[in-house]
Amino acid sequence: MHPLGPDGKVPRDGGARCNYTDEFTPGPAALINGAPRLLFLPVSGPAGMGETVRSMQIAYAARRRWPDAKPHFALSREAPLAADFPFDCTLLPASPTFHSAEVSQLIASLQPDVVIFDNSGRTRQLRAARAAGARIVYISSRPRQRRKAFRWRWRRMIDEHWIAYPRFLAGSLSWLERFKLRLQPQSTVRYLDVILPAPTPQAEARAAQRLGVATTPFALFVAGGVTNHPHAIDAVRIFVAAAKRCAAMGHRTVLIGTGEQAAAADAQLITLPRLPADELIALLRRAQVVVTNGGATLLQAMASGAACIAVPIAGDQPERIRRCVRAGVALAAPLAESAMAAQAAELLGSAAQRAALVESCQRLKLADGLAIAVQGLECLLRERGDS
């Protein structure tokens, strides 16, 4: 058993496995090779797609690290991305959490090296992964799922627990969580901070040119994957109306992923379909102001150097946004057309306020969550290869 230090970390000693880290340390290039089989089980359904997109980006990062990797997903057939999914996929009537028999059968059939549960999972499913000899990653982005991951029964099965948000949003480990890690040092906790696919400068410039935002400063409105979210049925409509109002004030405005088409009268409005992650990041890097919900896009915008206005559209987002405001890294606006447009216009007109927000974001030193995830997978695959 490794004692915890005063900062809640387990010291790295004697080659022992560290069970608390949010720092990325590159491993040897040849740490593990071959074609790892990775099974992703993100919570999915007709409303929202944050977990699916996060798991997709981790799968892409794994493919870059291991070109012959074999990612496989199980998704609800109602998920917004299910119809045109870029990886091998098993479609289920609802989220994988509700289909333990099918998920257990899939695990037994695929014999994955690692199973990644993203905000999903049942005890039966974790046991099936263990029975197949797989290593288990559990990603939590909400307090309830984090508590589940720290239950004694699950702690014995989970090899890596990845907390999807940075510490200033998700909170540091509690004394009880540190105590449980001390008793079970074989399990690792990592903060992913921000999932940020990084286009090259050349790719960013090409994307900006293609999308028509290469030169003119603009405000970017990104509603996110909230089309049918039960907590914000009208969110997309309100984002569209707010973007149009901002454009009508004379500000160059870009609206992404709502299906809306700009009318001829909307001279200052550019409407774009849902974009690949690297093109979205290219726009976030170039936008003066980003208006988005309190999910993953907010963190991506902050890490990209944009001044952000956060709008809550789901039940877990108001507290997250309050923490961002307290940290001085974002402004908050209600889900209301006039307030969103007015705040965007005000921030566009204040270079000093934008600079203060960006400077506060830079002080956070948000880590690259994809690099951290790949490091975790390398660790698990090395252990599996040695077992």
Question: Predicted regions: what is each one?
Answer:
Residues R54, I58, T200, T215-T258:
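Conserved catalytic-core segment of nucleotide-activated headgroup transferases in glycan assembly
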Residues L75-D84, A223, A247-P273:
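Catalytic donor nucleotide-activated moiety binding site of glycosyltransferases and closely related
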Residues L39-R65, H72-F179:
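Active-site and donor-binding regions of nucleotide-sugar-utilizing enzymes
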Residues V103-Q105, P276-A287, M302-A303:
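Short acidic alpha-helix that forms the nucleotide-activated donor recognition element
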Residues R285-G295:
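Acidic donor-binding loop of glycosyltransferase active sites
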Residues L366-S387:
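C-terminal alpha-helical cap of glycosyltransferases
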Residues L331, E337, Q343-R363, E383-R384:
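Conserved donor-nucleotide binding/catalytic region of nucleotide-linked donor-dependent transferases
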Residues M157-G225, T258:
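A nucleotide-sugar donor-handling region in carbohydrate enzymes
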